C-alpha cells in the first residue's frame, strides 16, 4: 500500500485463533479524501439508523482517477460527508440506492438541491422495485419531487418537470428477480444488482466492476439467500453491514445478519478483503443493548473473523481504502 504524506489512522482487525493482530491503514479525518488514488472505496457514513456518536448513516463512494464516479446510498449526514470528501456531483456516473429505509436515502433531496447549477448531463440513479408497503424507486422519487404533488415540488426538474434539479435517468432494479441485472455499462465500468433478503423491504446488493477490479456492496440483509455469495464471488472488496451481535434474537433477525453469517457469506464468496460497516447501537428504550454491534464492536468483529479467514477493515466515516 502506497505511503501518502497525509495523516493516517490505523484501524485494527483482530485475527482470531492465530494470535496475529492485523493493522490496516485508513484515513479518517475531515481532510482525508481519495482524490489522489487511482481506484479507491471511500466510506462516507459507517453508521445505521440510531442517532448519537460521530457516524453518519450509510453511504459510500467509488473513486477512479481522482473523481468520485459511483455513490451507493445517501443516508442521513452523508450530504455533509460528500462535501468533506471533496466529491463533486458532476463527476458521478451513478447514484445507487440499496433500499428505501431513511438511513440509506434521506439525504438524497439535499444532494439534488441546486444540482442543476453544477451538472448539465442527466444523472443515472438506481433503486429497488416495490413490495408490500414500499413503493418502487420511481414512484418514491415522484412522491419526493413531483412538481404538483411532491414533498419537494421545487425539485420537479429532476423528473423533467418544471422546477430545479438535474434531470434523473431512473433505473428500477427488480428485487425479486432470480438473476443479477445490469444497471450501468460504460467504459471499464460495469454495475450489476441483485435482490437480498431484508424482511419485507425490497433491498438491493450492487457489484461494481471497474478497471479489472470488483467492489460489492451487500446492503442490509439477513444472509439467507445463497445466491448472494455467488453474486459477490471473488470480490476485491466486499462491504457488509454489521448491525447486530452474535447474541441478537427476535424481530431484528428478520432484517439483519449475525456476525457469524456475515463472515460465512464473505468466506463463501472468497472475498479478498471484507469491509464491515453500518454499525448500530441500541435505541434508548431497548432492554437488550448487547444485541447491537456498537455495544462491543471489537468483540463483534472478532466473531466475524471466526468464519472469515481474510483481512477485515472496520469502517469509519471518510475512510479511504485504496484498491491496488
Regions picked out by a protein language model, each given a short descriptive name:
Residues 8, 51, 99-102, 253, ...:
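Short N-terminal micro-motifs specific to bacterial/archaeal maturation
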Residues 24-28, 52, 226:
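Residue-level recognition of conserved structural "scaffold" positions that shape functional pockets
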Residues 13-23:
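Bacterial N-terminal signal peptides
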Residues 2, 30-215, 301-323:
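Binuclear metal-dependent hydrolase catalytic cores
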Residues 2-14:
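Bacterial N-terminal signal peptides that target proteins for export
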Residues 4-7, 21-29:
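N-terminal twin-arginine translocation
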Amino acid at each position: 500500500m502506497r505511503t501518502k504524506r497525509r495523516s493516517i489512522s490505523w484501524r485494527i482487525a483482530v485475527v482470531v485463533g492465530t494470535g496475529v493482530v492485523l493493522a490496516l491503514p485508513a484515513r479518517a479525518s475531515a481532510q482525508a479524501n481519495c482524490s489522489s488514488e487511482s481506484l479507491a472505496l471511500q466510506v462516507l457514513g459507517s453508521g445505521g439508523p440510531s442517532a448519537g456518536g460521530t457516524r453518519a448513516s450509510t453511504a459510500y463512494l467509488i473513486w477512479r482517477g481522482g473523481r468520485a464516479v459511483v455513490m451507493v446510498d445517501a443516508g442521513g449526514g452523508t450530504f455533509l460527508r460528500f462535501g468533506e470528501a471533496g466529491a463533486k456531483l458532476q463527476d458521478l456516473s451513478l447514484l445507487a440506492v440499496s433500499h428505501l429505509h431513511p438511513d440509506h436515502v434521506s439525504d438524497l433531496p439535499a444532494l439534488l438541491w441546486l444540482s442543476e447549477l453544477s451538472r448539465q448531463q442527466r444523472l443515472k440513479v438506481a433503486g429497488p422495485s416495490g413490495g408490500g408497503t414500499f413503493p418502487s424507486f420511481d414512484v418514491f422519487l415522484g412522491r419526493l419531487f413531483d412538481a404538483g404533488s411532491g414533498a419537494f415540488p421545487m425539485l420537479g426538474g429532476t423528473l423533467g418537470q418544471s422546477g430545479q434539479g438535474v434531470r434523473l435517468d431512473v433505473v428500477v432494479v427488480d428485487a425479486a428477480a432470480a438473476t443479477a441485472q445490469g444497471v450501468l455499462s460504460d467504459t471499464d465500468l460495469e454495475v450489476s444488482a441483485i435482490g437480498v433478503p431484508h424482511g419485507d423491504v425490497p433491498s438491493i446488493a450492487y457489484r461494481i466492476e471497474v478497471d479489472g477490479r470488483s467492489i460489492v456492496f451487500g446492503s442490509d440483509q439477513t444472509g439467507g439467500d445463497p445466491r448472494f455469495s455467488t453474486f459477490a464471488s471473488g470480490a476485491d472488496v466486499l462491504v457488509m453491514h454489521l448491525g447486530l451481535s452474535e447474541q441478537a434474537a427476535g424481530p431484528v433477525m428478520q432484517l439483519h445478519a449475525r456476525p457469524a453469517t456475515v463472515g460465512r457469506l464473505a468466506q463463501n464468496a472468497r472475498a479478498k478483503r471484507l469491509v464491515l460497516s453500518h454499525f448500530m447501537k441500541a435505541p434508548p428504550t431497548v432492554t437488550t443493548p448487547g444485541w447491537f454491534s456498537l455495544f462491543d464492536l471489537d468483540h463483534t468483529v472478532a466473531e466475524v473473523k471466526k468464519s472469515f479467514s481474510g483481512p477485515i477493515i472496520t469502517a469509519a466515516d471518510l475512510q479511504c481504502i485504496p484498491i491496488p
